[in-house]
């Protein structure tokens, strides 16, 4: 089920999926989806607009309209300190509260919104990083070892676990099945 809550940005929009075991998950297309063509992040203007929305989410100035009524969310910092409940309205919160597995995303340096968020999460000035107990894992299928090494160093500086699964002879499907198996195994071991 797709809850298409926004036209341009993808702060609150997700896809609710149910697996064979009846467990429910949400898939967040952070940079838009084909069903909402205007939501696809193309260009600096869109990425910077997303950063503005994320900054508002942090500060408690993020607002939206639901059923004709304005809704204003509490600051993320208050949620992280336990002053108010997490509402699960956005994927932004999840970067601080639950394990995240990033798959199928090049995480190119032009994706300034995600780099901004990872930087914000890693900065001890904004939060007591000891309170952030979740793990972010990035699975990289980059073939170029130099690019992979550079990205690994930067991600690790942002407290992101980096796992390199190179695509062998362009057999991307096997690489992704291996990644999905690793994710499934990590869920069972907790």
Task: Name what the model sees in each region.
Residues 1-3, 15-23, 82-190:
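SIR2/sirtuin-family catalytic core signature
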Residues 1-61, 99:
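Extended, H/D-rich, highly charged conserved domains that either
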Residues 9, 47, 57, 62-64, ...:
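Sequence-level detector for tyrosine residue identity
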Residues 12, 31, 50, 60-61, ...:
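Generic signature of intrinsically disordered, low-complexity segments enriched in small/polar residues
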Residues 35, 59, 63, 67, ...:
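Generic surface-pattern signal
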Residues 48-95:
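Acidic, metal/cofactor-coordinating or nucleic-acid-engaging core segments within structured domains
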């Amino acid at each position: 089920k797709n809850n298409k809550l926004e036209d341009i940005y993808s702060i609150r929009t997700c896809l609710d999926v149910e697996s064979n075991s009846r467990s429910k998950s949400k898939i967040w297309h952070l940079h838009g989806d084909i069903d909402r063509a205007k939501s696809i992040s193309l260009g600096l203007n869109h990425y910077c607009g997303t950063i503005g929305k994320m900054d508002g989410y942090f500060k408690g100035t993020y607002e939206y309209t639901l059923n004709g009524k304005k809704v204003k969310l509490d600051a993320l910092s208050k949620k992280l300190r336990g002053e108010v409940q997490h509402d699960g309205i956005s994927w932004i919160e999840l970067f601080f509260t639950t394990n995240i597995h990033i798959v199928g995303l090049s995480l190119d340096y032009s994706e300034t919104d995600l780099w901004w968020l990872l930087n914000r999460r890693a900065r001890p000035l904004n939060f007591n990083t000891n309170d952030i107990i979740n793990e972010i894992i990035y699975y990289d299928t980059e073939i170029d070892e130099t690019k992979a090494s550079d990205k690994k160093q930067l991600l690790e500086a942002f407290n992101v676990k980096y796992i390199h699964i190179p695509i062998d002879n362009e057999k991307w499907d096997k690489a992704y099945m291996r990644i999905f198996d690793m994710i499934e195994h990590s869920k069972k071991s907790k």
